[in-house]
């Protein structure tokens, strides 16, 4: 039997999603909890492998099991065995054609900026603090150069293992609510550090250090060294993964949910 789960987690205390030797990861914690409930070893496949410090409100995983359990066992039962900063949000039995990564048609990330001269206390691990005067309207305008299928070499991590630098950005929006600026970007898939590298360069535009057209120029240059530094990890959230409607997976609010001014 193949089971899909929706997962939410605060990634600030983990060395990323993917299981690694001798460090704490989200995948390891989830697999341990699932294995307890299933009473057999469980290995999961995820839609997107988030880096250290990165969060998710809309991660999707699937796994194979011989265990027959009620839905509440895969939600409430697994959550009892998870740390407080990881939670199962929904469960659905799926057919064998479903794959959390390979049947996904799009991923969506939100990057949350706390724009204030003084750093936050309560939300310090859930937002990235950037002081100074940031013009989110200019960031939004510059971000429109990213739309469509393009070569994103300038926004690709040096250690990225993808066979191609081409990705298709479906939509990107930059908006402000009070002290919070949200960079919301959806694409068919993302390169390693692609969102954080894009945000780092958009911030240079928003801070007035570069013109709006700089993003277009960076795309044409195809040179990671010409773009800005990678933005901090703690403001980044995987908020949604899109699948064909035929799978009828549950849909929840995207998040992250903050009390905004």
Swiss-Prot record:
Keywords for the protein's UniProt record, in alphabetical order: Isomerase, tRNA processing
Gene3D superfamilies in the record: Pseudouridine synthase I, catalytic domain, C-terminal subdomain, Pseudouridine synthase I, catalytic domain, N-terminal subdomain
Record-annotated active site: 51 (nucleophile)
Family annotation (InterPro entries): PsdUridine_synth_cat_dom_sf, PsdUridine_synth_TruA, PsdUridine_synth_TruA_a/b_dom, PsdUridine_synth_TruA_C, TruA/RsuA/RluB/E/F_N
Annotated binding of substrate, by residue: 109
Pfam families per UniProt: PseudoU_synth_1
BP terms from Gene Ontology: tRNA pseudouridine synthesis
Keyword Isomerase carried by entry: yes
Catalytic activity as recorded in UniProt: uridine(38/39/40) in tRNA = pseudouridine(38/39/40) in tRNA
Enzyme Commission identifier(s): 5.4.99.12
Coiled-coil annotated spans: none
GO molecular function: RNA binding; tRNA pseudouridine(38-40) synthase activity
Signal peptide residues on this chain, from the entry's feature table: none
Root EC class: isomerase
Domain of life: Bacteria
Regions crossing the membrane: none
Subunit-structure text: Homodimer.
Task of the protein: Formation of pseudouridine at positions 38, 39 and 40 in the anticodon stem and loop of transfer RNAs.
Recorded family membership: Belongs to the tRNA pseudouridine synthase TruA family.
Protein name in UniProt: tRNA pseudouridine synthase A
Species of the source: Shewanella halifaxensis (strain HAW-EB4)
């Amino acid at each position: 039997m193949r089971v899909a789960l929706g997962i939410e987690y605060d990634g600030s205390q983990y060395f990323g999603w993917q299981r690694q030797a001798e460090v704490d990861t989200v995948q390891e914690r989830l697999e341990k909890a699932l294995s307890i409930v299933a009473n057999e070893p469980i290995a999961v496949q995820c839609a997107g492998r988030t880096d250290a410090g990165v969060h998710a409100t809309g991660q999707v995983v699937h796994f194979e099991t011989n265990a027959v359990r009620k839905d509440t066992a895969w939600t409430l039962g697994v959550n009892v065995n998870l740390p407080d900063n990881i939670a199962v949000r929904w469960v659905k039995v799926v057919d064998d054609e479903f794959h959390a990564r390979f049947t996904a048609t799009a991923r969506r990330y939100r990057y949350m900026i706390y724009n204030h001269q003084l750093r936050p206390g309560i939300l310090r691990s859930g937002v990235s603090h950037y002081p100074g005067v940031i013009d989110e309207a200019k960031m939004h305008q510059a971000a429109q150069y990213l739309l469509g299928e393009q070569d994103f070499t300038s926004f690709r991590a040096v250690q990225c293992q993808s066979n191609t630098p081409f990705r298709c950005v479906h939509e990107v929006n930059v908006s402000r609510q009070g002290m919070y600026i949200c960079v919301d970007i959806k694409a068919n898939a993302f390169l390693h550090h692609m969102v954080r590298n894009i945000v780092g360069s958009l911030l240079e535009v928003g801070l007035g250090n570069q013109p709006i057209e700089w993003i277009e120029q960076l795309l044409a240059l195809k040179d990671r060294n010409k773009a800005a530094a990678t933005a901090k990890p703690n403001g980044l959230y995987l908020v949604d993964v899109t699948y064909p409607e035929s799978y009828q997976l549950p849909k929840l609010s995207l998040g992250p949910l903050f009390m905004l001014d």
